From Swiss-Prot:
This is ATP-dependent Clp protease ATP-binding subunit ClpX. The keyword Magnesium does not apply. Residues 1-52 form the ClpX-type ZB domain. The lineage of its organism: Bacteria, Pseudomonadati, Pseudomonadota, Gammaproteobacteria, Moraxellales. Component of the ClpX-ClpP complex. Forms a hexameric ring that, in the presence of ATP, binds to fourteen ClpP subunits assembled into a disk-like structure with a central cavity, resembling the structure of eukaryotic proteasomes. Belongs to the ClpX chaperone family. The gene is clpX. Zn(2+) binds at C11, C14, C33, C36. ATP binds at P120, T121, G122, S123, G124, K125, T126, L127.
Amino acid sequence: MSEHPQGQKHCSFCGKSQAEVGKLIAGENAYICNECVDVCLDLVQTSQQVEAGDWASRDLPKPHEIRAALDQYVIGQDLAKKTLSVAVYNHYKRLKAGQSGHVSKHEVEIAKSNILLIGPTGSGKTLLAQTLARLLDVPFAMADATTLTEAGYVGEDVENIVQKLLQKADYDVEKAQKGIIYIDEIDKITRKSENPSITRDVSGEGVQQALLKMIEGTVASIPPQGGRKHPQQEFIQIDTSNILFICGGAFAGLEKIVQQRHEKGGIGFNAEVKKKDETKKLAELFRQVEPTDLVKFGLIPEFIGRLPVIATLEELDEAALMQILTEPKNALTRQYQSLFQMENVDLVFEESALRAIAKKALERNTGARGLRSIMENVLLETMYDLPSRKDIGTVVVNEAVIRGEAEPEYKKEHTQKKDTHEHNVADLKVIDSKSA
């Protein structure tokens, strides 16, 4: 214990006596003064700043590199990937410049460019946002706009979104302030009509108003460790100025508004009559979206102004869905093959089976999102039996299985070569039904 013969207590770290310092905190066989506590606090804060600075010192992926990374997980959507790559690169370049203290020649303040993703259900909006966050190694939080309401009403407060991001960052405020928030179903919070209403629209225009400041940049007060707010509580302050907000929605019916704008004036005897097959495709119409179209759809002008970057996604066709099943790093067929290999069983899909899965997803109009449910239904009985069977080496799925006309074929022998130490799931075996 740091105690002199005279009985006077001293700090175990700096050696100063109780009379020389403001406070002396006693521990087991040791003391620490308030000055040493301040020094320790400074050291911890400096260490945290260095860790945060590590992000700024890293090489920021260039747009081409971001696009290449997205290509590994997302099939198609070339224009959307290019738009996102540039927008995300510029956003984090802006952050990096601010962190390093770099000021442009004319001291121009670069505004934040949040992103609006417009595309059909299952076209890859959420996956794009998740992949970007994983690539940049930043916290990522997702929220459903349909659950949001204005503060004071039953439902989820918009500040809860930032709270989710803070939780994902393990309550590291510096880390959370560089994260990405994806708000899905943003098209569901449009105002009910273009005319002002006497009743309060707490889940439509009201939510847009509540999101305005959050998206643009404000200091949000978040209760610690996800607790509820109460007046005597200390809050965690989070600045949302550098958080990248990506909003996505299917915007069903928006294409009709764009089409009407293009056809305006084509009325009368000299109007050109278009055949049905000449009607512009959904993707082409989405690419021509203007802010006025979004206002007509029900988004308020101020909200649209906070989302200056608009990226549109195309509806996935059969070929794209087949690619999604086999080509990405985490392709669905590879995921199921990996599950089967844990039971020491090979899983083989005939090409006709993959085509049938893609066709079924198109019929359901669920895009890539519907592929997993189809696969689950097809393989349910097999996955139920497999752990109890030791006589199966290979499971073959053909077109008839997908159509519900047959059961998967079980074979005793393995069709894929295995490493004795490790299963390689990188290469999926796809065979043509003609050669089977």
